[in-house]
């Protein structure tokens, strides 16, 4: 086992022609995150001293998307093979460090497998990640003598006997910096593809008497690459099934694990229940006994104990204290905050608004840029008119206020404690405590009124 420092090289220069997309292949997302970001995260979790990202196609988009402080951007202007890609990064290698080679389109490689690979790397030799396949067609074969790895032969260059070998190269390896630089300098493109294969260094190491140790991943999905959208979709389901299994074993009740997506992280309490077709994005926290109805989307939000979110509600960048109820068909936008026991019903939208303890907005309401006190009733059709066409303004409502249906609160405006606002009122001025406010056009009755008759 090597105790050397370690840097990581991630190959991410490919165009991804079979994705049929203008987006670089490695920026296509898995579980809501670019594939290459999964690999960068694994490198960081391993404690890499540096991460060298070899890029080519779509470099500007890559730079706009990835913002890791320790990324060293290495341009591969021409894509002439994996060995050529590593040659571009080689000037940045330290002689006394280990270099781990990863791929931006192999997103599910686990930290645990990479730790085992690093631990298995012999001094002065190479650690190689391999798998055995029933159908190895198209993959580089691992050649052995007396069970010792001697080289890798690409499928197009393999003999018929070599093509019967089931152990294949995953492309992931680790070697010392000084050794790797020396071997990379010796690579040639004398092969069927006319490319520089990184795999040729295995034979070089063997000829020098260096040991090559093969390690197998825990799961085949860890080393599956993505070349088209079908493969990406399959890996997405593999990843989601793994997340669902972990949650079920940790006590979360997923009504249908096959219809649940976690696209980020979830912290959860006890006795959490999640119905079908729920999507959790970003960093989500669910307290004890939280219930999430079917079809809900929750992003970067904290949901307190005993909250219930009814079906088809969307909660984004919001904070819910204990015992709140939401939906169905509610939308909490960034900055929404519900204090203990608050209720937001169907077709209610909140943004940058706080709803106090025990307060209710039952239906068909917009609350934006608002501070609403405790024990307030917001009637159906109420709107905080917060935008004047250029700027946003705030509405402040005190405690124990009753807001009748179809009320418009034209901000900036402040409503005192204990106020009653009659249905159909347009509030344009501040209201003092305990006042009744109404503004209606006088009701007109015309006896004997007849409706117009259509002209023929």
Swiss-Prot record:
Region entry N-acetyltransferase, spans: 251-456
Residues where acetyl-CoA binds: 380, 386-387, 405, 423, 440
Cofactor note: Binds 1 Mg(2+) ion per subunit.
Gene3D superfamilies: Hexapeptide repeat proteins, Spore Coat Polysaccharide Biosynthesis Protein SpsA, Chain A
A GO cellular component entry from the record: membrane
Location of the region described as Linker in the Swiss-Prot/TrEMBL record: 230-250
Ranges for region Pyrophosphorylase: 1-229
Residues that bind UDP-N-acetyl-alpha-D-glucosamine: 11-14, 25, 76, 81-82, 103-105, 140, 154, 169, 227, 333, 351, 366, 377
Function statement: Catalyzes the last two sequential reactions in the de novo biosynthetic pathway for UDP-N-acetylglucosamine (UDP-GlcNAc). The C-terminal domain catalyzes the transfer of acetyl group from acetyl coenzyme A to glucosamine-1-phosphate (GlcN-1-P) to produce N-acetylglucosamine-1-phosphate (GlcNAc-1-P), which is converted into UDP-GlcNAc by the transfer of uridine 5-monophosphate (from uridine 5-triphosphate), a reaction catalyzed by the N-terminal domain.
PANTHER family: BIFUNCTIONAL PROTEIN GLMU, NUCLEOTIDYL TRANSFERASE
Similarity comment: family membership: In the N-terminal section; belongs to the N-acetylglucosamine-1-phosphate uridyltransferase family.
Complex and partners: Homotrimer.
Protein name listed in UniProt: Bifunctional protein GlmU
Species per Swiss-Prot/TrEMBL record: Klebsiella pneumoniae (strain 342)
């Amino acid at each position: 086992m090597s105790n050397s420092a370690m840097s990581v090289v991630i190959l991410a220069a490919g165009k991804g022609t079979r994705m049929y997309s203008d987006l670089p292949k490695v920026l296509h997302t898995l579980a809501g995150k670019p594939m290459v970001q999964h690999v960068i995260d694994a490198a960081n979790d391993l404690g890499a001293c540096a991460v060298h990202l070899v890029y080519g196609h779509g470099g500007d988009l890559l730079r706009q998307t990835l913002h890791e402080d320790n990324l060293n951007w290495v341009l591969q202007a021409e894509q002439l093979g994996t060995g050529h890609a590593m040659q571009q990064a080689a000037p940045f290698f330290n002689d006394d460090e280990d270099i781990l080679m990863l791929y931006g389109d192999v997103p599910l490689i686990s930290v645990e497998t990479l730790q085992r690979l690093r631990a298995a790397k012999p001094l002065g030799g190479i650690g190689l990640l391999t798998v055995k396949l029933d159908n190895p067609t198209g993959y580089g074969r691992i050649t052995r003598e007396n069970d010792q790895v001697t080289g890798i032969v690409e499928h197009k260059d393999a003999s018929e006997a070599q093509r019967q070998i089931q152990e294949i190269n995953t492309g992931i390896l680790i070697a010392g910096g000084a050794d790797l630089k020396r071997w990379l300098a010796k690579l040639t493109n004398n092969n069927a593809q006319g490319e520089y294969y990184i795999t040729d260094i295995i034979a070089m190491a063997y000829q020098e008497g260096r040991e090559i140790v093969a390690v197998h991943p825990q799961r085949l999905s860890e080393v599956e690459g993505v070349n088209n959208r079908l493969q990406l979709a399959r890996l997405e389901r593999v990843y989601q099934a793994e997340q669902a299994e972990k949650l079920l074993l940790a006590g979360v009740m997923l009504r249908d694990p096959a219809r649940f997506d976690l696209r980020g992280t979830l912290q959860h309490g006890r006795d959490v229940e999640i119905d079908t077709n729920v999507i959790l994005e970003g960093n989500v926290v669910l307290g004890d006994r939280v219930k999430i109805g079917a079809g809900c989307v929750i992003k970067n939000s904290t949901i307190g104990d005993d909250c219930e979110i009814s079906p088809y509600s969307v909660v984004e960048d919001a904070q819910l204290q204990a015992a709140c109820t939401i939906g169905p068909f509610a939308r909490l936008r960034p900055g929404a905050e519900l204090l203990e026991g608050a209720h937001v019903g169907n077709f209610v939208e909140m943004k940058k608004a706080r709803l106090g303890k025990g307060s209710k907005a039952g239906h068909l309401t917009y609350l934006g840029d608002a501070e609403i006190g405790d024990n307030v009733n917001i009637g159906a059709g109420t709107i905080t008119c917060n935008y004047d066409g250029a700027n946003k303004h705030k509405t402040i409502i005190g405690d124990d206020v009753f807001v009748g249906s179809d009320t418009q609160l034209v901000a900036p405006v402040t409503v005192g404690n204990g106020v009653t606002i009659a249905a159909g009122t347009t509030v344009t001025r501040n209201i003092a405590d305990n006042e009744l406010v109404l503004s209606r056009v006088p009701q007109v009755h015309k006896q004997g009124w007849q409706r117009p008759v259509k002209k023929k």
